[in-house]
From Swiss-Prot:
The gene is MT-CYB. This is Cytochrome b. It comes from Nilgiritragus hylocrius (Nilgiri tahr). Its main location: mitochondrion. Heme 1 (or BL or b562) is low-potential and absorbs at about 562 nm, and heme 2 (or BH or b566) is high-potential and absorbs at about 566 nm. The cytochrome bc1 complex contains 11 subunits: 3 respiratory subunits (MT-CYB, CYC1 and UQCRFS1), 2 core proteins (UQCRC1 and UQCRC2) and 6 low-molecular weight proteins (UQCRH/QCR6, UQCRB/QCR7, UQCRQ/QCR8, UQCR10/QCR9, UQCR11/QCR10 and a cleavage product of UQCRFS1). This cytochrome bc1 complex then forms a dimer.
Amino acid sequence: MINIRKTHPLMKIVNNAFIDLPAPSNISSWWNFGSLLGICLVLQILTGLFLAMHYTPDTMTAFSSVTHICRDVNYGWIIRYMHANGASMFFICLFMHVGRGLYYGSYAFLETWNIGVILLFATMATAFMGYVLPWGQMSFWGATVITNLLSAIPYIGTNLVEWIWGGFSVDKATLTRFFAFHFIXPFIIAALAMVHLLFLHETGSNNPTGIPSDXDKIPFHPYYTIKDXLGAXLLILXLMLLVLFTPDLLGDPDNYTPANPLNTPPHIKPEWYFLFAYAILRSIPNKLGGVLALILSILILVLMPLLHTSKQRSMMFRPISQCMFWILVADLLTLTWIGGQPVEHPYIIIGQLASIMYFLIILXMMPVASIIENNLLKW
């Protein structure tokens, strides 16, 4: 009798995706981040669900309800900090996952890559709205500053901002709708992740060499199920180290002050995972220009397949491109640092140079490096 997992309509889908899936024999730990992102998403949905049971999306009580969760709800503090630091782990995994895709040329799978970019945007939007919910000082002013950027759009900008706010400032209506959107968005992200996987399984995984691996495939289970489980154990370890020892390490102290529209904090800044984009936004003196640069800093990922000039897919055998890639990583770390600094000398000029470098490396230096490498192959 044939195995039930190969015949049952539902189990067949799971079987083809996680058990009998043919996988390359040489994919490294950089290929673990996809499953880790799935774990992060499930964890965020579960902790978020339990937080939503005790949270009240109202300007009068939001801050108090979060305090109530931490003080009075059984294990509320651990749920709250797992959710807050879970977002940080989520973005660490996201950046690693995207970095892996850039390094090994995974962007050649166009549909998978483009849905991945949409997923990145959706996750960033969701995280932003989540940061507003505790209704601390940084929540309120972060929401005010970032939503206000839309007013830079010519003609319809001001109307658009007031429409999003549901009034003439960030207020009760804004908080309520942000809570609604923050609740629904992870389920949309989960659905998109399914489509992401669907397209990936049409082609099969890439591998570090960038060479087709049809000749040497192994079953996903047990080889990569055990590897994923190890990655998951390390992810949970790192998350719980953060949660149990330094839960506020990545947060902003200003968010422990209730939101006050009459008092602006001296340095408005987003969570650490948005700082690189925030630095690019601030480095351009023009409002609309800054907003465009902010959007393009992420949207530029869509252009990666067009900017690929190399004869090889992966960077594994391309030392000049490797150099460019790691300079780009260093540049992003520099931008992250600058994003958290006040707008004063020398941070302004460093931010501007790092922003120029970011676009220059991606649009010019990496494609040129690839062409040089192609020519070196002829020697």
